[in-house]
Amino acid sequence: MADDEEIDIEGDDDAPLLFDHKDDALALPDLPGYEPNWMFDHGQEIYGRSWTSISQFVQTRTPLQVKNYARHFFKTKVVQKVEEGEDEDVDIEGEESGEEAVMELRSTCGLNPAQPAVVTSDDTSTGENVMEETEAVTEDHPSLDNLVQDDREMPQQETTGDGEQYPMDEHFLPVFPWQPDDTQNRVIVERIEGSVGLGSVRGDKDVRPVPGVEQNTYGPHTDMFQVQNTLLAFEKQVGADRIFEGPSXSKNEATDTQTEVSETKTEVIERQTESQVDATHMHTYGDGLMGSIERLTESVSSSELKEDLKTGIEYVEKDDATDSSSTAKGYDNYTLDHPEDRSKPDSVVSEKWSCEEAMSSHTDGRTFSDSDSGKETYDLPRYNTTIFQGHSEDETSDAGQAEEETFFTFKKPTEEVVLDRSVITEEEKEVHKEFFDGRQTKTPERYLKIRNHLLDCWERTKPEYLRKTVARAGLRNCGDVNCIGRIHGYLERIGAINFGCEEANRGEFPVAKVGVKRNPQGHGEQLALQAARLESMHVTSDELEKQDGGVSQIRPNRSRAARTNLNSFSYDPFKLVPCKRFSEESPAPFSVKIHATALVTIDMHAHISTAEVIGLLGGVFHRDPGALEVASAEPCNSLSTGMQCEMDPVSQTQASEALSQAGYSVVGWYHSHPTFAPNPSVRDIETQTKFQEWFAQGGSPFIGIIVNPYSSTRISPLSRVTCLTISSEWNPPAIQRVKLLSRYAGHTDTTYMDKMLYSLSGHLCRGNADSDEDGNSESLTLLTDIRDIFANSWTSSLGTTPRSSIASL
């Protein structure tokens, strides 16, 4: 954003709005009556310098746009402070003070769930009452001087563009907790110790009018609103001296706070005398909400709520007895009173409810009970927990999942359990609910197949420990690895498999979450919210053009398949190549006989190291029967790097001398693949080919042996051994010859030969540019000869006549 662009800092009505770009392709239509400047201002008070959160709060701007505007906003704010002569430091970056300001602002405005701010709403309220409210709110937070806010008058009704009213949910009335009133002026003084990150003294110009709501109406996008239960008229009991007194308040702190607040008392009274508060709207709002509470309580099962409340109270009394007792003294003294409606003189009965605040800071809603009967108690829905408690929806859902997760505890088995292969017990149905709830992919038959396969594998490998990765090799299309692992863990805990093994896990067994609702929102709402977030994070080419100041360059999107094909031709020396067995069609050039002593030496050498080992093979080659006899194996030192293995030249010489002294000649080499398949790698094939060429000069064969001692997919404890030799036969290469007589690139009259001759003539013409006609004739003769050579080679096999013209050349 340009530095010289005019930005609405003071809130004038005729100033341009935030990001007021007509041509911006990303600029969505703003909410009716909600100006982005006002949304940014109050979004900053709630979220601090979190531009992503503010952008989601505004809903029509991306985080990058919000960040650019904030940078320009604070830069202009510094210039304004300097021009006014103020020497207070303004925090521009807001790394530390912004976070402190948000915490102070949340706790001061009553956003802390442990200490809510209760505000009275009397018809005869004056500036003194406002000062008492400020004193009660800021009593526990001396870092802020005062916070004076009066939201007791409801603004005008919001309508759509066609003049129709928005429908209102009959259960709650959405109100912003920070909502300013256009019928009154307010003064907000926010001072943070050490800096003024969010602090400023704002009067008429700073506060923008917000479209209000009346009963049965609301503004668009109700998910932006939070229900304020504290906006109800709370009536103080007889004998109470103060509106609200927190459990940790003291008289000295109250006196100091009252002294600081009195400095702005005169200014507040003057501003409030300019516009009187209309209390009728509040009474109307109270009537509607009280009726909604009655309908809500009648529609909910009282027995279930009684049990939930009883459990919650017992939990609070046990875990937080001290805090709950002290807090109850401050909270239980307030009665929610539904006073007589002045607009309806006939109403005589006044409904009274006792407001009981939950003692735990994690309580999601306030609890209301009938003070007269004292029988039924109800919890209001958790509408106001997102902003007040400072927890996100993801944290709330994660906490719910942790609470709902259950475990099965099994006793340590004393003897091996033998299960009937055709019967599924009730315990298995309870533990593995996912296979018995009617799913198409997970059926009881599939569960039996997985369980019986694990039991069969255990019968073959006992008493060795059976790992689930080994058993999974024999299960194809039988479910995901998680469900196989859960069945393996269950059988292990009851003693059906891995009985007597030290590696067996006997701890708690988690139950698969079947039917647990991970997100409290509906599926449609969740998809809509996710789509809105993705849309807000999308950056178009037009926006990039505006940011960079020029035309954006769009790079072509390369397909994943193209990159995969290019990488497939790269040289990988560690790629394993499967071997091809000899058959009757391609018999082995000679037979191999290995002595048991040599095989024991190779296997023992491979077992003592997790890295690759290497050595030489000694034996005799019998030419008449064409048999190679391997009688001895000599281990050698290796130059292993963990990824490859090479033989030490000094050790190789010593091993060759030892085999010669024993009367054997070198007939091969061996090495190990500790944990992967005994297939040769590309590097092994190169080494084997090199050795075969050396020994083939003397007419002797040369073989290679690969041993795999620790196989992760083999159930048997025996090592896997592969004996290989490189065949002299090569597969014919793929046909890549170009058919010169075929059409070139879809042209009807041009062949590949015509294209080749035309290209050659261009080179010859440039070389004979300064020559005479004799040079041109020689070039034409050369092209004719080239055409005849290629044409004859193709026509001899196809029996056709080439159709190629050189007249134009």
Curated annotation (Swiss-Prot):
Zn(2+) binds at residues 671, 673, 684. Keywords: Activator, Chromatin regulator, DNA-binding, Hydrolase, Metal-binding, Metalloprotease, Nucleus, Protease, Transcription, Transcription regulation, Ubl conjugation pathway, Zinc. Residues 592-719 form the MPN domain. A motif (JAMM motif) lies at residues 671-684. Pfam families: JAB, SWIRM. Coiled coil: none annotated. Residues 113-140, 320-378 are annotated as: Disordered. Its main location: nucleus. It is found in: Nucleus. Residues 33-78 form the SANT domain. Its EC number is 3.4.19.-. One of its GO terms (biological process) is positive regulation of transcription by RNA polymerase II. Residues 335-345, 363-378 have a biased composition (Basic and acidic residues). The keyword Zinc applies. GO terms for molecular function: DNA binding; histone binding; histone H2A deubiquitinase activity; metal ion binding; metal-dependent deubiquitinase activity; transcription coactivator activity. The keyword Zinc applies. One of its GO terms (cellular component) is nucleus. Binds double-stranded DNA via the SANT domain. The SWIRM domain does not bind double-stranded DNA. Metalloprotease that specifically deubiquitinates monoubiquitinated histone H2A, a specific tag for epigenetic transcriptional repression, thereby acting as a coactivator. Preferentially deubiquitinates monoubiquitinated H2A in hyperacetylated nucleosomes. Deubiquitination of histone H2A leads to facilitate the phosphorylation and dissociation of histone H1 from the nucleosome. Acts as a coactivator by participating in the initiation and elongation steps of androgen receptor (AR)-induced gene activation. This is Histone H2A deubiquitinase MYSM1. It comes from Branchiostoma floridae. The lineage of its organism: Eukaryota, Metazoa, Chordata, Cephalochordata, Leptocardii.
